[in-house]
């Protein structure tokens, strides 16, 4: 797909650096307002991006896999922090827009379809630890609805059976939705399922994001 001139200039000229800085300033401003208003979930985009970047820096995986591209804001934010990005989007319009947005980046790989169906094929080709940002769920508006409101258990099945599963880092958005309704397991059910496969992992919820991965020395000290 041909890269639009706007995105080509953003990618190859100093204007792109300024545009990125301006976007980050706008997002930080919204985040500060959210904090001042009481920090009621969900976490704003800038906050989510900073969480993912933090874990990319701590664990240093070469690959990030995202389920739920939406408008590509997470992909755009983490580009400087990881070598390869794979992102899956169910909605055809969002997928097409993302392909145009990232057409000039050889290290960004976009896929259309249900993440529970597409993710196994991606993982089959990647024989190394990944950070997985799991955000593929129906949330109204322009988001697409698949057979299930969330494919999280399908995703878990293929992720935890991957040869490098023990070294993956999983960040799952919208922890508040894990109530046992609308195809979501409860947090307790999800924790039990994950730790049955990876008993040496931590499982914690903070800022509406489930964070589960191998224990670090800092985790053992807590």
List where the protein language model places each region.
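A short alpha-helical cap/connector motif
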Residues: 1-131, 137-222
């Amino acid at each position: 797909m041909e890269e639009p001139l706007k995105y080509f200039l953003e990618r190859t000229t100093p204007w792109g650096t300024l545009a990125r800085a301006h976007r980050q300033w706008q997002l930080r401003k919204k985040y500060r307002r959210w904090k001042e208003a009481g920090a009621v979930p969900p976490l704003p985009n800038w906050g989510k991006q900073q969480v993912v970047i933090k874990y990319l820096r701590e664990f240093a995986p070469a690959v990030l896999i995202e389920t739920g591209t939406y408008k590509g804001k997470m992909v755009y934010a983490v580009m400087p922090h990881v070598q390869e990005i794979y992102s899956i989007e169910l909605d055809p319009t969002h997928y097409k827009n993302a392909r145009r947005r990232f057409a000039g980046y050889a290290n960004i790989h976009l896929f259309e379809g249900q993440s529970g169906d597409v993710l196994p094929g991606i993982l089959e080709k990647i024989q190394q630890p990944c950070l997985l940002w799991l955000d593929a769920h129906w949330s109204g508006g322009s988001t697409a609805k698949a057979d299930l409101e969330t494919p999280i258990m399908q995703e878990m099945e293929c992720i935890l059976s991957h040869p490098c599963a023990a070294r993956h880092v999983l960040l799952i958005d919208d922890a508040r939705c894990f109530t046992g309704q609308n195809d979501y397991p409860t947090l307790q059910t999800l924790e039990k399922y994950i730790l049955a496969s990876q008993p040496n992992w931590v499982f914690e919820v903070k800022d509406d994001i489930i964070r589960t991965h191998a224990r670090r020395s800092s985790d053992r000290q807590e």
